[in-house]
Structures are given as structure tokens and as C-alpha cells.
């Protein structure tokens, strides 16, 4: 949860039951900033939304009280974290981890937002960027490639929090 270590590398070796999601865009992608977004059920009755808006961490994380604006104590006990955020241009990598004991009943949704082209709803720059998402879970690695469609928001997959079944969405839209 330390914001000063956002540029460090994250290992793909993780504990059983833990899921790591890694977003990557390359040097020649034409993109400067792509943001990871994960929503899911929190410890309370609502949903969390993990992402990094304008340099301020916005998520429910138990050890980051000072930057979790409006979070209740029970929401802060959700240990899902944005481990690495990259906002300094290409190439870039962002990492989200869901520890084994943090899974809640309900649907999780992972998306990537082309922040570079956020003002263009009909852009195809994201679709030709070569951006990938890799998911590591229980000794398996799954790779998702950005679809060839216009838009600046890529909804990659959903996860059932009870069964941990990942369902591919792979859809583009605009925000």
C-alpha cells in the first residue's frame, strides 16, 4: 500500500488462491497512460473500485487509511490492492492483486482505460496498441489481447468471487 513504491517490479510467483492481474502496454503502443480498474464486492454491502485517479490512490485497503477517502473500517479490511501504477509513459505496467483470503461472494470486473485517448470516444488507437493483460492464478497464466474495436475502455473479464471462474468479456466501449 505504499505509494512511493509504485514503479517497482512485481513477481508473478504468488500464493495459492491469490490472483495477480498485470496490464502492459509497449514502447511503440502509441499510448502514454493506460489505467487498470477493478470493481468488486466489498466487506460491507457495496462495491469497491480500485484505480489511480490523478495521482491519488482510490481503493479500500486496510493499511492505507490516510488515502482511502470515505472508507469505513470494514471496507478498509478488504486487502485487494493496486500494487503498481504506471503513469510516466510507455512502456507501462500496472498490477492488481487479490489475495486468497480476500475473495467475496459476487462479481468482480476488470477493465483497462486508455487514459491517453480519454477524450476520443471513437478512437481505434487502443485497439492497435498491442496492449495485453495477463492473469496469474493457481499456477496458470492466461493472456488477453486488446480487441480490434473502437473505444477507450476495454472490459477484459469478470470473476465469480465464490467459484473464482473467470469469464472473458473482451469488449470495447467509450467513456
Mark where each language-model region is.
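Elongated, non-catalytic scaffold/linker segments and compositionally distinctive motifs
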Residues: 1-17
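Intrinsic-disorder/low-complexity signal
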Residues: 14-175
